[in-house]
């Protein structure tokens, strides 16, 4: 990945609220299935904004911080996804998204961020990201003092 896109907590909440507004009316949803781990925080934000209490997870491992590797389903929510929102932070190459679509063919699959290769696999997303860009999510970063450029 040549570029980095840094996401702040404020930006993430703004994007999640925008996505939540597109998922109204809330009565159409039975619950949320968050893709662990990237979809956990966005899933919590959607659950809060939409007032949804039924939240489950599908646990899929496909990354080690910045390296993609073999896909493993560690835990899945039951059913075919009918009436459920499946949320992940990002659709990238589409590997995880294909697995989600196979497991939950009737779910409404959404992400906050979408790269071109995976974009056709989601029902909705908020932010376009170039394919060669790595996203630094706020839960992967700490707040650190940065000295002034002039060194004062």
UniProtKB/Swiss-Prot annotation:
Q: Which EC class, in a word? A: transferase
User: What topology does the record note for this protein and the membrane?
Assistant: Peripheral membrane protein
Taxonomically, the superkingdom here is Bacteria
| InterPro entries, per database record | PRibTrfase_dom (IPR000836), PRTase-like (IPR029057), Xanthine_Guanine_PRibTrfase (IPR023747)
- Provide one Gene Ontology biological process annotation: IMP salvage
Q: Which UniProt keywords apply?
A: Cell inner membrane, Cell membrane, Glycosyltransferase, Magnesium, Membrane, Metal-binding, Purine salvage, Transferase
**Gene Ontology molecular function, alphabetical:** guanine phosphoribosyltransferase activity; hypoxanthine phosphoribosyltransferase activity; magnesium ion binding; xanthine phosphoribosyltransferase activity
Q: Which residues bind 5-phospho-alpha-D-ribose 1-diphosphate?
A: 37-38, 69, 88-96
List positions binding guanine.
Answer: 92, 135
Enzyme nomenclature, EC number: 2.4.2.-, 2.4.2.22
The family database entries (Pfam families) matched by this protein are listed as: Pribosyltran
User: What pathway is it annotated to?
Assistant: Purine metabolism; GMP biosynthesis via salvage pathway; GMP from guanine: step 1/1; Purine metabolism; XMP biosynthesis via salvage pathway; XMP from xanthine: step 1/1
**Residue numbers binding Mg(2+):** 89
What job does the chain carry out?
A: Purine salvage pathway enzyme that catalyzes the transfer of the ribosyl-5-phosphate group from 5-phospho-alpha-D-ribose 1-diphosphate (PRPP) to the N9 position of the 6-oxopurines guanine and xanthine to form the corresponding ribonucleotides GMP (guanosine 5'-monophosphate) and XMP (xanthosine 5'-monophosphate), with the release of PPi. To a lesser extent, also acts on hypoxanthine.
NCBIfam families attached here?
PRK09177.1
PANTHER family xref list: XANTHINE PHOSPHORIBOSYLTRANSFERASE, XANTHINE-GUANINE PHOSPHORIBOSYLTRANSFERASE
| Protein name per the record | Xanthine-guanine phosphoribosyltransferase
Species of origin reads Klebsiella pneumoniae subsp. pneumoniae (strain ATCC 700721 / MGH 78578)
